[in-house]
From Swiss-Prot:
NCBIfam families: L9 (TIGR00158)
Keyword hit for Signal: no
One matching Pfam family: Ribosomal_L9_N
Protein name in UniProt: Large ribosomal subunit protein bL9
Bias type Basic and acidic residues, positions: 156-167
Taxonomic classification: Bacteria, Pseudomonadati, Pseudomonadota, Alphaproteobacteria, Hyphomicrobiales
Species of the source: Rhodopseudomonas palustris (strain BisB5)
Gene: rplI
Length: 194
């Protein structure tokens, strides 16, 4: 089916372009959401009359999106999750979790605006894209950690795994010095027998 795009659609085209799409995509997504019109002669004339109004609305929406983009550009949100010692999460961080973190910071973003290829499954700092408008995308970082303190260390650039190795080395040094429990050692007092 041929349609006329009423706004920019990712991986499809710009506003006003005549594109050929599968019938189901047009009927179930583009037409009901007002993103396109069927490419009939009457609709082509209708689009030409609406073109100036659509462009004005697009400019207004883009300006509002630019304000939101300025507010969140480079922003860092923290998501706390349980994880193993190796940094693998017990579960994952999805788009819904990221939206919830933004809402906690007072920023209104929808799930469809976050461009995340696959759920996040490891501890660390991850960069994702947020499309606040079809023509405006910004990068934000998501810090996934087991605690707020660990998130702060990750944001400072500390390597969490090397810190664990340092703790293990300190424990081995204490053990080598002989400051550990000896099960064969004599006790000072013997318990009373009954």
């Amino acid at each position: 089916m041929e349609v006329i795009l009423l706004e920019r659609v990712a991986k499809l085209g710009q506003m006003g372009e005549l594109v050929r799409v599968k019938d189901g995509f047009a009927r179930n997504f583009l037409l009901p959401r007002g993103k396109a019109l069927r490419a009939t002669a009457a609709n082509r004339d209708k689009y030409e009359h609406m073109k100036a109004d659509l462009e004005a609305r697009n400019i207004e929406a883009k300006a509002e999106a630019a304000k939101v983009a300025e507010k969140i550009d480079g922003k860092n949100v923290i998501v706390i999750r349980q994880a193993s010692e190796t940094g693998q999460l017990f579960g994952s961080v999805s788009v819904r979790d990221i939206v919830t973190s933004f809402e906690a910071d007072g920023v209104k973003i929808t799930r469809s605006q976050i461009l995340l290829d696959a759920p996040i499954k490891t501890i660390g700092r991850h960069t994702i894209e947020v499309a606040v408008h079809p023509e405006v995308e910004v990068g934000v970082s998501v810090t996934v950690a087991r605690s707020v303190e660990e998130a702060e260390r990750i944001n400072r650039g500390e390597d969490i795994s090397s810190r664990r190795e340092d703790q293990d080395a300190a424990a081995e040094a204490i053990a080598a010095a002989g400051e550990f429990f000896d099960p064969d050692a004599q006790q000072d007092e013997e318990p009373e027998q009954q």
